Each structure stands twice: as C-alpha cells, then as structure tokens.
C-alpha cells in the first residue's frame, strides 16, 4: 500500500471561490503539489478541473519537479455532463494516471432518473478509459438523497456498469446507516482505490456543511484522528483482504494548525500502517 494526498479541500476553494487570475490560481495549486511532496507523500489525487485550469503540460511539469505520481483524477458532476470525456482520458494517459474517479453530482432529484444518468454516462467514460488501460472508479457517497450511498445502491451501479470499480471511502457510508468495516469487506474484491477519511457526528445541525443522516443526525468531514472512524480496525481489515493499492488521504485541515505541520501530522499518522 502507498499513501496519496487528496488535496480536494485545498483545490476546491482556489478553483471556485477565491478571486485571482488563471496564473495566480495555478501558482497556488503548484504550492499544494510541492507541499505534498515535501511532507512525505509520493502520490497525489487531483480534481479534473485543476488539470483543465492549469493545463496538462504544466501539471506534468509540476509533478515531475516534485517527484510525485498522479494516482487518480477526480471528475465531478459526471451524471449531468460527460462532455469532454475524450479529453479526460487523453489527459490521464498523457500524465501517466491509471485511475479516473467518477462523481455523479445531482442533476436530477428523482433517484431512479439519476441512477439511469449515472449508468449511461459512467458506461461511456469506462469504455473510453478501458481502451487505454485506465480504470474508472466510483465511491460510496455521503449524500443520502442520491443513489450512491447504501451498499445496495453502490452494488447496483457496479453491476450495471461492467468494468467499473469502487473507491471505498472509509466514512461516506455512515450517513446511510452502514458500518465502516463490513462495508469494506463486502466490496473488498471490487475495490480499486481507497479514500482514508474521518468523520464526526453531531446531534444538531452545525454551522458548517454537514450531510444529513438517515438517523436524523449530521455527518461532517473531520481532521484525521478527531472523528469516529476506527483506523486500527480498518487497516487490519485492509491487510486481511490483501489490499495493496493506493490509500488517498482525504485531507481535512485541522483548525488553527499550520498547513505544512498538519499535512505532515496526517502523513505520520498513517505512514507506519502501510
């Protein structure tokens, strides 16, 4: 097993909320890539919008200069818009990335309608990617309003799209009422990528964004080591089932902590377990 840094929580504000020119945003993205390498990681997971903004040639330069491998490209809103699928696959091939993660978004409120969109658009990109030796993966999603959370829902998608594998997320099944370890063990043979994430649970709706759970509680992404996920039990299960691929750390910054120190803290938390 190898650790990867999933910088989604750092990229997203730069891409969609912070002001700045393309060049300024690209420079900030490069600082995250450099920091990932400097804090011990050998791999990184990036959002497709980041690759588009910066340009695949510049991303390749940044990765090569930092000595990082691009382990996965994360594509958002795939159920609603699959335009540019050829470009996604082409960029991944150019960057030496062997995995594409598909995130559905929620372009339809009806679960059945959204399921049909997911199957249609996922199938298209899976077929394109497989021709280039690239694996497509989808994850268990914490949004219980879309058909991607429960074990049964995820299994239905995997069964409907041949060649699609699971990104097992170590916390996303909690809002739907599933359990961390049994969920992984059920899908162990169909898991090709893993997100290591922690999650906290609140009885009342918090000020920050949280996913409502089927039990009426609220589920928030949490800094690693501060939430409810039992990582000792999880790593025992991973080794038991022979998982030997990438573990992407879904980084959530610790409030008030220096970013470099925090990224290194999380690396040290898991480095001895792989």
Please state what every model-predicted region is:
Residues 1-99, 130, 163-165, 267-274:
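N-terminal pre-domain/capping segments
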Residues 45, 72, 101, 137, ...:
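Conserved beta-strand positions in the central sheet of alpha/beta enzyme cores
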Residues 54-60, 83-89, 115-116, 144-162, ...:
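Distinct, well-ordered alpha-helical segments
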Residues 127-228:
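Acidic/histidine-rich catalytic cores of soluble enzymes
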Residues 226-240:
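A short, acidic, amphipathic alpha-helical segment used as a generic capping/interface helix at domain edges
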Residues 245-270:
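C-terminal/domain-terminus segments
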């Amino acid at each position: 097993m190898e650790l990867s840094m999933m910088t989604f929580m750092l990229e997203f504000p730069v891409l969609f909320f912070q002001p700045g020119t393309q060049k300024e945003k690209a420079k900030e993205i490069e600082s995250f890539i450099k920091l990932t390498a400097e804090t011990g990681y050998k791999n990184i997971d990036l959002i497709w919008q980041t690759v588009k903004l910066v340009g695949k040639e510049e991303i390749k330069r940044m990765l090569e200069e930092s000595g990082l491998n691009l382990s996965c490209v994360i594509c958002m809103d795939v159920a609603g818009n699959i335009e540019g699928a050829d470009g996604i696959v082409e960029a991944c091939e150019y960057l030496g990335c062997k995995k594409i993660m598909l995130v559905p978004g929620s372009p339809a409120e009806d679960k059945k309608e959204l399921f049909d969109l997911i199957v249609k658009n996922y199938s298209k990109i899976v077929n394109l990617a497989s021709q280039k030796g690239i694996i497509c993966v989808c994850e268990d999603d914490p949004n219980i309003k879309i058909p991607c959370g429960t074990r049964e829902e995820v299994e239905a998608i995997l069964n409907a799209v041949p060649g699609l594998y699971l990104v097992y997320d170590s916390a996303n099944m909690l809002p739907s009422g599933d359990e961390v370890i049994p969920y992984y063990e059920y899908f162990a043979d169909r898991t090709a990528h893993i997100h290591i994430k922690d999650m906290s649970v609140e009885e009342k709706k918090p000020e920050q964004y949280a996913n409502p759970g089927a039990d009426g509680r609220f589920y928030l992404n949490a800094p690693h080591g501060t939430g409810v996920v039992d990582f000792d039990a999880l790593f025992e299960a991973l080794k038991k089932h022979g998982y030997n691929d990438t573990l992407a750390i879904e980084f959530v910054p610790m409030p008030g902590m220096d970013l470099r120190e925090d990224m290194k803290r999380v690396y040290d938390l898991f480095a001895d377990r792989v």
